[in-house]
Amino acid sequence: MIDAEGFRANVGIVICNGHGQVFWARRINQQSWQFPQGGIHEGETPEQAMYRELYEEVGLKPEQVEILYTSRQWLRYRLPKRLIRREQRPMCVGQKQKWFLLRLKCREEDVDVLHSGHPEFDGWRWVSYWYPVRQVVSFKRDVYRRVMKEFATQAMPFRASGGRQHRRKR
């Protein structure tokens, strides 16, 4: 679904573990890494799209994760001019995304990025919470920064300010 301004409705997924780390996936046959994301189909809610994309791209079912938080706003990024398909109608100039923060409830071994017939990723790993903001492709960086800032207290309740705060005994 592409809106009147040319932005495709999309969901983004941040999966965290109990150690303040997030799921980071490598795009198939590329050296670029990102969070799982994907388009919202006609008649689908953002949550339904998130669960569909989660299964298609990561091989996880709803009962294997817990939704901790959903972004308050739709966040947008523009595609670089070289990536815009000008012959496509309607023309897509970028993505508008609703983001979901999930906690993994199952074993890591249950993650299977290669399970679908058309995988988006060929590898994954856990990375430190803020790592993706520095490593994602530049045109997504602002959205990642905003998402991670918004999700920080939910993803790492004791680490949002950089670590646990200890009071000195007087």
Curated annotation (Swiss-Prot):
Source organism, top-level taxon: Bacteria
Chain location of the short sequence motif Nudix box per the record: 38-59
GO biological process: one example: mRNA catabolic process
InterPro entries attached to this UniProt entry: Nudix_hydrolase, NUDIX_hydrolase-like_dom_sf, NUDIX_hydrolase_CS, NUDIX_hydrolase_dom, RppH
Molecular function terms from GO: mRNA 5'-diphosphatase activity
Cellular component aspect of the GO annotation: cytoplasm
Family, per entry: Belongs to the Nudix hydrolase family. RppH subfamily.
Protein name: RNA pyrophosphohydrolase
Species for this entry: Idiomarina loihiensis (strain ATCC BAA-735 / DSM 15497 / L2-TR)
